[in-house]
Amino acid sequence: MEETILTANALKFRYDPEQPTYALNGVSVGVRRGEFVAVLGANGCGKSTLAKHFNAILLPESGKVYVEAMDTADDSKLYDIRQTVGMVFQNPDNQIVATVVEEDVAFALENLGVPPQEMRRRVDESMKMAGIYEFRERAPHNLSGGQKQRVAIAGVVAMRPDCLILDEATAMLDPRGREQVMQTIHHLNKNMGITVVSITHYMEEAAQADRVIVMSKGHVVMEGTPKEVFSQTEKVRSLHLDVPQAAELREELVKAGIPLPEGIIDTGECAQALYELLK
């Protein structure tokens, strides 16, 4: 049985206890170690609220959240939880605190009292992993949005987390910046074994995940592999979400009488299916 690193059991949360509306209303989900999970949903669905529970930024009103069996409501476990789960937010400018890239990556390690030699090794490894080593002596404000976000990721990865949560970390980036960041994230997941939970509204990003969770009005309403979720195009659209462009193209071609198989969610699959029909 695969080990579960993040668990929410019957999680309920309101930002205002005086109001009847729950941001999370009975959410039960689990994330397995080494998995890449994308969490989707329209604005206000509760996806970012869920992400903040996995890092103990927010605590349940009722129900439980566990990080490697540590209860997030246990104050004595807070340090260990945040060592286990790192978080990268939407705006990279809000996460950068130093005037030189390598100093920013080292910032948290300095606060933890990591010995200088170990710190140097971790900082260099993290910058190389994130593809920013060549910028190590540059000022962060001179970097592009995608490069800044990779600086933020390197700073988190230097802490050696087992899990990385991205709270719409590519939302403010241009297409090239998004591509750079996602390449880095996939490298962390596939080559370093870091569990990834990506809160996103980009369907093409979600299509590359191992599993997709869809939320609506504080509930989990869909869950499965990208193929299982995005094959249900009508249901996905009813939740005010798009589907990957390849899935949309496949749908239109089928309507035009071209018999393409179900489950096509990326352009490579779509091109291969068309090639098989034409050869």
Q: What do these predicted ranges mean?
A:
Residues 164-167:
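Catalytic Walker B motif of ABC-type/P-loop ATPase nucleotide-binding domains
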Residues 139-143, 147:
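Conserved ABC ATPase signature
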Residues 63-73, 81:
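Conserved ABC transporter NBD signature motif
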Residues 55:
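Helix-to-loop junction immediately C-terminal to a conserved catalytic motif
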Residues 117-135:
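Conserved ABC ATPase "signature" region
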Residues 40-42:
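The feature captures the beta-strand-to-loop junction immediately N-terminal to the Walker
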